Amino acid sequence: MAKTDIARRVYNHAWKLDPIIRSLIDTDFYKLLMLQMIWKLYPDVNASFTLINRTKRVHLAEEIDEGELREQLDHARTLRLSKKEMIWLAGNSFYGRAQIFEPEFLAWLSNFQLPEYELSKKDGQYVLDFHGAWKETTMWEIPALAIVNELRSRSAMKALGPFTLDVLYARAKAKMWSKVERLRELPGLRISDFGTRRRHSFLWQRWCVEALKEGIGPAFTGTSNVLLAMDSDLEAVGTNAHELPMVAAALAQTDEQLRNAPYKILRDWNKLYGGNLLIVLPDAFGTAAFLRDAPEWVADWTGFRPDSAPPIEGGEKIIDWWKKMGRDPRQKLLIFSDGLDVDAIIDTYRHFEGRVRMSFGWGTNLTNDFAGCAPTEISGLNPISVVCKVSDANGRPAVKLSDNPQKATGEPAEVERYLKFFGTEDRVDQTVLV
């Protein structure tokens, strides 16, 4: 892969449009896995997605030019899968399985285009919504977030000269490499890049992936970014996300259907996927509620991804549940991925070493950590907590509770209804940084 002088590239914006999204597969792998399931099992469901900036002190509409945002969103809508990308998706093995994507699905995907968007401003924030068929709107989540985050980075660096940019990226590279060196202390580490959605930029994410590949070798197990996996000859990694149980719950007509929504999604998932893709994401409506009501067959799945509780605390609860269900945790897998940086990775690894199989998904603090790297403080280079979540399904409001109330999304009245239904056990407020 050709090396890019990122500082020079950032400074030299002589072209009309520097695309942030270069390909429809510049997205997370689990979006494609989920898309196939949605296409196959939920083809007629409509779902809306909404951009949510949880870092309220940052007014995105004041930092990002609306014209530039529209240009990037419009450009993303022009993209189609290339012949090379189609061949790679059809011919490659993922998670040890050939032809994980059905030919009929790929034929449909070959003509895929991102649907239209709605953009406005309110109270210094952008209101960005995507309405339509779930099998279309779901694919906006990652590119929308990547566009917003990179435009914010570009805006913060607009006034910087070439020398300052050179210093900025030199320091960021040194900071990143020092993290890589610390990870070498963990002999059985398995870690992958989960940093697409809130990355500083595509080029910076690519450099971070190359650094991990070079620095920790086989301990680096792949990237969630499908384009980077293809271009760098890496494994594409990822399982499933909260949107699946959120939509199933929104569609529920009875209390029984609402209670069973997370498990219905797992059954649906297992119709298409197996093995190391059988990873449970338990916290959409609170991990305690999920474990309390879970059928015994859930304990036979490969592992869990505790996503909003503190990693050690969340991992211990799942290990206790496995033991209660008569399963040996040493044969199970925990994937930690919530807001991790190198200290948390090391602490979590050492805490659970020998007790359970572990893997780590390293996200924003891998691909967007520029704190202290600029010669003067530039607040626009600090990452923010911005997400793009399902807001409704077939016109019915969607809710995510999470183990951290700060991460809850949905209409307040609906959130309250879900809390009364699923309970508030083990939900603990934690500051959300990314």
Swiss-Prot record:
Q: Which residues carry this modification: Phosphohistidine?
A: 242
Q: List keywords of the entry alphabetically.
A: Ligase, Phosphoprotein, Pyridine nucleotide biosynthesis
GO cellular component labels: cytosol
Disulphide bridges in this chain? none
**What's the PTM story here?**
Transiently phosphorylated on a His residue during the reaction cycle. Phosphorylation strongly increases the affinity for substrates and increases the rate of nicotinate D-ribonucleotide production. Dephosphorylation regenerates the low-affinity form of the enzyme, leading to product release.
Question: One Pfam family, short name please?
Answer: NAPRTase
The EC number of this protein is: 6.3.4.21
Q: Is Repeat a UniProt keyword of this protein?
A: no
A molecular-function term among this protein's GO annotations: nicotinate phosphoribosyltransferase activity
Q: Which SUPFAM superfamilies match?
A: Nicotinate/Quinolinate PRTase C-terminal domain-like, Nicotinate/Quinolinate PRTase N-terminal domain-like
Asked if the keyword Thylakoid belongs to this entry, the reply reads: no
Q: What class of enzyme is it?
A: ligase
Biological process (GO), any one:
NAD biosynthetic process via the salvage pathway
Swiss-Prot/TrEMBL catalytic activity: nicotinate + 5-phospho-alpha-D-ribose 1-diphosphate + ATP + H2O = nicotinate beta-D-ribonucleotide + ADP + phosphate + diphosphate
What pathway is this protein said to act in by its record?
A: Cofactor biosynthesis; NAD(+) biosynthesis; nicotinate D-ribonucleotide from nicotinate: step 1/1
- Functional summary from the UniProt entry: Catalyzes the synthesis of beta-nicotinate D-ribonucleotide from nicotinate and 5-phospho-D-ribose 1-phosphate at the expense of ATP.
Q: Which family does it belong to?
A: Belongs to the NAPRTase family.
> What is the protein's given name?
Nicotinate phosphoribosyltransferase
Please give the organism: Rhizobium etli (strain CIAT 652)
